[in-house]
C-alpha cells in the first residue's frame, strides 16, 4: 500500500465514520471512482482496518472522556441502589448496543457478500440521503427531551437503527441520529447519543480482530500510522459535528450530499461496471 493511499484511506475512515454519510459505502465507492482497487484478501488490509477502528474509537473516548467518567460513575452508583440520570443513560447505552452486537456477529459477513455490487451501494447511499432528509423533518416536529430521560424501549429502538449500517451505503451515525430524533432528542443530543452509542461498537470491531494486528508485525508501522491519522481526523470530525448541531445544523444538508453522491456513483458504475 502506497503512503498516499494509506493517508487517503485513514482520513476517509476518520471523517466518514462519524459524518452521517456511510464510512463503509465511501470506502468502497471513492477508491473505485479513482480506479483504485482494494484487495480484501491482501494480508496487510485487515491489521490496517483494525487500527483504523481503534483510532476512531479512541478519538471518541477522548472527546467524550468527561461524559464517560460520569456515566461509569453513575452506573456503579445505580448498581449500589442510588438512582441517577447518568446511571440510567449508561443502562440505555448498554441496551442500545445489544441489537447490533448480536446481529453484527451473526450476519455481517453474509451481508457484505450480498452488497458487493457498487451500484447497490450507490442506491443505498441515495436511500440514506432520503432518510436523513426525513429525519430532519421529524426532529423539527417533535417535542424534545434529554437523553437521560429516554426509556429503555426508546434506547433499544435507537440501537436497532444501527443494524442498518451493516449494509454499505447506510450510515450508523445517520440512522441513530434519525432514531434519536424520533425518540424526541434535539439534533445536538441525538448526535451525542449516537456517538456514545457507537463508541463500544466501533471499539469492539477493532478489539475482536486485535490479535491479527500483532500477528502481522511487518505491517505494524503502516497500521500505527493509519490509526493515528484516523484518530486525528475522527477527533476533528466529532468536534466539528457537535458544534454544527449545537448551532442548529441540520441532517438534511448531509442528506442532499448523499443523494447527489449516490446518483453520481450509480450513473458512473452503470457506465463503467466494476468486476465483482
UniProtKB/Swiss-Prot annotation:
Q: What is the lineage of its organism?
A: Bacteria, Pseudomonadati, Pseudomonadota, Betaproteobacteria, Burkholderiales
| Listed name of the protein | Undecaprenyl-diphosphatase 2
Which HAMAP family does the entry link to? Undec_diphosphatase (MF_01006)
Q: A cellular component term (GO) from this record?
A: plasma membrane
Q: Which reaction does it catalyse?
A: di-trans,octa-cis-undecaprenyl diphosphate + H2O = di-trans,octa-cis-undecaprenyl phosphate + phosphate + H(+)
EC number(s) in its UniProt entry? Answer: 3.6.1.27
Q: Which family does it belong to?
A: Belongs to the UppP family.
The annotated topology with respect to the bilayer is:
Multi-pass membrane protein
Taken from the record, one Pfam family name reads: BacA
InterPro entries assigned: UppP
Q: Which UniProt keywords apply?
A: Antibiotic resistance, Cell inner membrane, Cell membrane, Cell shape, Cell wall biogenesis/degradation, Hydrolase, Membrane, Peptidoglycan synthesis, Transmembrane, Transmembrane helix
Source organism (scientific name): Burkholderia lata (strain ATCC 17760 / DSM 23089 / LMG 22485 / NCIMB 9086 / R18194 / 383)
Note, other: Bacitracin is thought to be involved in the inhibition of peptidoglycan synthesis by sequestering undecaprenyl diphosphate, thereby reducing the pool of lipid carrier available.
The gene coding this protein = uppP2
- Where does the record say this protein resides? Cell inner membrane
Q: What is its main location?
A: membrane
Transmembrane stretches, by residue range? 1-21, 44-64, 87-107, 114-134, 150-170, 190-210, 222-242, 251-271
**Does the record's keyword annotation contain Amino-acid biosynthesis?**
no
Any one biological process term the GO annotation gives = regulation of cell shape
Q: What GO molecular functions are on record for this protein?
A: undecaprenyl-diphosphatase activity
Functional description taken from the UniProt entry: Catalyzes the dephosphorylation of undecaprenyl diphosphate (UPP). Confers resistance to bacitracin.
Amino acid at each position: 500500500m502506497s503512503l498516499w493511499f494509506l493517508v487517503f484511506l485513514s482520513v476517509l475512515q476518520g471523517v466518514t465514520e462519524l459524518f452521517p454519510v456511510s464510512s463503509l459505502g465511501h470506502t468502497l465507492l471513492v477508491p473505485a471512482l479513482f480506479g483504485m482497487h482494494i484487495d480484501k484478501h491482501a494480508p496487510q488490509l485487515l491489521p490496517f482496518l483494525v487500527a483504523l477502528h481503534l483510532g476512531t474509537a479512541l478519538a471518541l473516548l477522548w472527546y467524550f472522556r468527561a461524559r464517560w467518567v460520569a456515566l461509569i460513575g453513575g452506573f456503579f452508583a445505580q448498581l449500589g441502589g442510588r438512582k441517577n440520570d447518568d446511571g440510567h443513560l449508561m443502562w440505555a447505552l448498554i441496551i442500545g448496543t445489544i441489537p447490533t452486537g448480536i446481529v453484527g456477529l451473526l450476519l455481517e459477513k453474509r451481508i457484505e457478500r450480498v452488497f458487493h455490487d457498487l451500484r447497490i451501494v450507490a442506491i443505498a447511499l441515495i436511500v440514506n440521503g432520503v432518510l436523513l432528509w426525513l429525519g430532519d423533518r421529524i426532529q423539527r416536529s417533535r417535542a424534545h427531551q434529554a437523553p437521560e430521560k429516554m426509556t429503555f424501549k426508546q434506547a433499544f429502538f435507537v440501537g436497532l437503527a444501527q443494524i442498518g449500517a451493516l449494509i454499505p451505503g447506510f450510515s450508523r451515525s445517520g440512522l441513530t441520529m434519525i432514531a434519536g430524533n424520533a425518540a424526541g432528542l434535539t439534533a445536538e443530543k441525538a448526535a451525542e447519543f449516537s456517538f456514545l452509542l457507537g463508541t463500544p461498537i466501533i471499539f469492539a470491531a477493532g478489539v475482536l480482530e486485535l490479535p491479527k494486528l500483532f500477528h502481522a508485525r511487518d505491517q505494524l508501522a503502516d497500521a500505527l500510522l493509519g490509526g493515528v491519522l484516523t484518530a486525528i481526523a475522527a477527533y476533528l470530525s466529532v468536534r466539528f459535528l457537535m458544534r454544527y448541531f449545537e448551532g442548529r445544523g441540520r441532517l438534511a444538508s448531509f442528506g442532499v450530499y448523499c443523494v447527489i453522491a449516490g446518483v453520481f456513483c450509480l450513473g458512473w458504475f452503470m457506465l463503467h461496471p466494476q468486476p465483482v
